[in-house]
């Protein structure tokens, strides 16, 4: 017998399972049945594509069996799927690879019911069995191999792994139930209820095996003689699920509850979906899709190793659930099924990535999903829930999917200078509100909505009744928005990198102002040195003394700078342009000041104050405070 230590995070997870997540213990059956179904899917695929397995499994049919023993306080879940060898058991149960227990632990909220719903999303569903088990034995034999193995654990820090004997391929999970759980889960009616609730539309039959006391039928003579029927114990073998490919059934026959139950069985989510999209397509390519959008974004949505939520079938035969190219990455939150009538069963991953049929299915699926999201957008309340969860990946779509760029832009929602806090606007609504002379969409990017709404750069736009989009998700908006270019011929313009809206000032008046302040502009630039690219007078301000802007070239470099930072590489920040308001009292007094020390202090205050107003960092907060103190003292 070989003893193995659990991966550190697994031990931590098992402790959580047994001590924290009490509220929804029944999900362990859902998780183990889903795993059994996946194992059968894999063997079903291999027997049709692997020459070494075709003959041996020609008559094979996948099924799942559940047995229980009230006296023994035990429960067994058995499948005849692909099975596991020694390496598989260590990789699948002894460690957690892709989804990461650390992320699971970090995502825990302290709400036991919510936390139990995270189990499946993080691919740690097997371990949920330790919520109800004193001990678990996993006996498995891999298809095409001779040796079977037994994995055993009490859910503490280690597990045993030993060779054993098993006649056929597949996996048996024997669960020795805790005393307090046996009454609930070693029960025919409870098991049937749980399977019907979570796994009714698993594609393979699920049989419940149990002993039942029955009375033998009496003959007419024995009945007349008053004899009592003899009782005996019969072994029952009852199918307890529908075992149908739900997506192939006509939509007219399916109820919302059918769709919701199936979603829960494939997504490991205990909530109903936000949106269900069921489509059968005929023509050049014939395929059926059943897509779901979850109410809550998948926990791994922003991980590079996110798990694809879409399964590919060919004529009801499972092919893969690990192909991220079935849908574009900006739709990685979508869950569901694609079932093709035209793809070959032995399609390889390389062929999948270049296959014309699959490319057509992908294109058609994307258009359908976007069209259904657009329908959802007509309900403002429901669409606000969608936007709260998925606006970021949708924005990625603008960058990734030129074909559907316009359709995606119609789905985007933005905060703006004319919307209340918590409300958002579409680009179409923005256009409709604009005055007849406006032919551009103006925006400002930053990290804090309140700071952006109070930015001095908005002053001239408010004065001219021009709406500005408030983009407070800088991490993505700084990259994506410049790439949009235009929406229905209206160009996107960053107000930090363009001239302000027209003001009632002739060229002659403008020139006169510049000449009047030429000397002080030169002095300010000299005092600030490399901290600024230039110093100018501006007409964009009505209340603030100064602001900072970028020139057009620097605005284009912002996205590149962000990408460099994301890769951990430094890229020097471009110095801003400082603009001062010639109508402001501070600037007027500064223009007539002869004290060089005061000019230097005020110059730096104008720059640092402008940067703070845009949510930017200032290089020397101590010096800023000292300058303010000196200027305040002089003013008293």
Swiss-Prot record:
Main subcellular localisation: cytoplasm
Function noted in UniProt: Molecular chaperone. Has ATPase activity.
UniProt cross-references to InterPro entries, sorted A to Z: HATPase_C_sf (IPR036890), HSP90_C (IPR037196), Hsp90_fam (IPR001404), Hsp90_N (IPR020575), Ribosomal_Su5_D2-typ_SF (IPR020568)
Stretches for region B: 350-562
Keywords of the record: ATP-binding, Chaperone, Cytoplasm, Nucleotide-binding, Stress response
GO MF: ATP binding; ATP hydrolysis activity; ATP-dependent protein folding chaperone; unfolded protein binding
Localization terms from the record: Cytoplasm
Any one of the GO CC terms: cytoplasm
Region A: start-end pairs: 1-349
Family, as annotated: Belongs to the heat shock protein 90 family.
Origin superkingdom: Bacteria
Organism whose genome encodes this protein: Aliarcobacter butzleri (strain RM4018)
SMART domains reported in the protein's UniProt record: HATPase_c
Gene3D superfamilies: 3.30.230.80, 3.40.50.11260, Heat shock protein 90, C-terminal domain, Histidine kinase-like ATPase, C-terminal domain
Protein name per its UniProtKB record: Chaperone protein HtpG
Oligomeric form and interacting partners: Homodimer.
NCBIfam families assigned to the protein according to its UniProt record, in alphabetical order: PRK05218.1 (NF003555)
HAMAP family: HSP90
């Amino acid at each position: 017998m070989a003893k193995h230590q659990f991966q550190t995070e697994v031990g931590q997870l098992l402790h959580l399972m047994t001590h924290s997540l009490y509220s929804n213990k029944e999900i362990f059956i859902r998780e183990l049945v889903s795993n059994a179904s996946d194992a059968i899917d894999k063997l079903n695929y291999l027997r049709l594509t692997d020459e070494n397995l075709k003959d041996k499994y020609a008559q094979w049919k996948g099924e799942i069996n559940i047995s229980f023993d009230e006296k023994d306080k035990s429960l067994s879940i058995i499948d005849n799927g692909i099975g596991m060898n020694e390496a598989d058991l260590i990789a699948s149960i002894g460690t957690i690879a892709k989804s990461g227990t650390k992320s699971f632990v970090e995502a825990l909220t302290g709400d036991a019911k919510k936390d139990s719903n995270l189990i499946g999303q993080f691919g740690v569903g097997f371990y949920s069995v330790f919520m109800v088990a004193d001990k678990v034995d996993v006996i498995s034999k891999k298809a095409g191999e001779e040796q079977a193995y037994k994995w055993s654990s009490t859910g503490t820090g280690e597990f045993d792994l030993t060779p054993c004997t098993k006649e056929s391929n597949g996996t048996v999970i024997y669960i020795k139930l805790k005393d307090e759980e046996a009454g609930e889960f070693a029960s025919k009616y409870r098991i049937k209820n749980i399977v019907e609730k979570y796994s009714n539309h698993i594609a393979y039959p699920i049989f419940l095996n149990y002993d039942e006391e029955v009375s033998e039928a009496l003959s007419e003579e024995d009945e007349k003689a008053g004899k009592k029927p003899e009782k005996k114990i019969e072994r029952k073998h009852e199918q307890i699920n529908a075992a149908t490919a739900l997506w192939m059934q006509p939509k007219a026959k399916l109820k919302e509850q059918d769709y919701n139950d199936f979603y829960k069985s494939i997504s490991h989510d205990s909530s109903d979906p936000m949106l269900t999209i069921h489509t059968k397509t005929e023509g050049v390519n014939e395929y059926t899709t059943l897509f779901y959008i979850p109410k809550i974004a998948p926990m791994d949505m922003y991980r590079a190793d996110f798990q694809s939520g879409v399964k590919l079938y060919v004529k009801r035969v499972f092919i893969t659930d690990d192909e991220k190219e079935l849908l574009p990455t900006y739709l990685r939150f979508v869950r569901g099924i694609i079932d093709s009538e035209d793809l070959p069963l032995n399609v390889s991953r390389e062929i999948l990535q270049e296959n014309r049929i699959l490319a057509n299915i992908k294109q058609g699926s994307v258009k359908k999903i976007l069209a259904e999201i657009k329908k959802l957008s007509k309900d403002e309340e429901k669409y606000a829930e969608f936007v709260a969860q998925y606006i970021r990946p949708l924005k990625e779509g603008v960058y990734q999917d030129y074909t559907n760029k316009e359709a995606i832009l119609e789905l985007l929602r933005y905060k703006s200078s004319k919307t209340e806090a918590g409300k958002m606007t579409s680009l179409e609504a923005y256009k409709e509100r604009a005055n007849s002379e406006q032919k551009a969409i103006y925006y400002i990017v930053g990290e804090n909505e309140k700071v952006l709404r109070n930015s001095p750069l908005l002053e001239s736009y408010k004065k001219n009744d021009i709406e500005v989009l408030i983009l407070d998700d800088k991490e993505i908006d700084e990259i994506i928005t410049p790439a949009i270019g235009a929406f229905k011929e209206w160009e996107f313009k960053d107000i930090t990198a363009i001239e302000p809206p027209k003001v009632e000032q002739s060229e002659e008046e403008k020139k006169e102002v510049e000449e009047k302040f030429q000397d002080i502009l030169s002095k300010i630039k000299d005092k600030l040195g490399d901290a600024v690219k230039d110093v100018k007078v501006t007409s964009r301000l009505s209340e603030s003394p100064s602001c900072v802007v970028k020139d057009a070239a620097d605005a284009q470099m912002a996205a590149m700078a962000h990408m460099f930072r994301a890769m951990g590489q430094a890229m020097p920040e471009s110095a801003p342009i400082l603009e001062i308001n010639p109508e402001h009292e501070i600037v007027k007094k500064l223009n007539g000041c002869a004290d060089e020390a005061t000019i230097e202090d005020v110059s730096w205050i104008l720059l640092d104050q402008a940067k703070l107003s845009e949510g930017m960092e200032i290089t020397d907060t101590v010096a800023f405070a000292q300058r303010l103190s000196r200027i305040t003292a002089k003013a008293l």
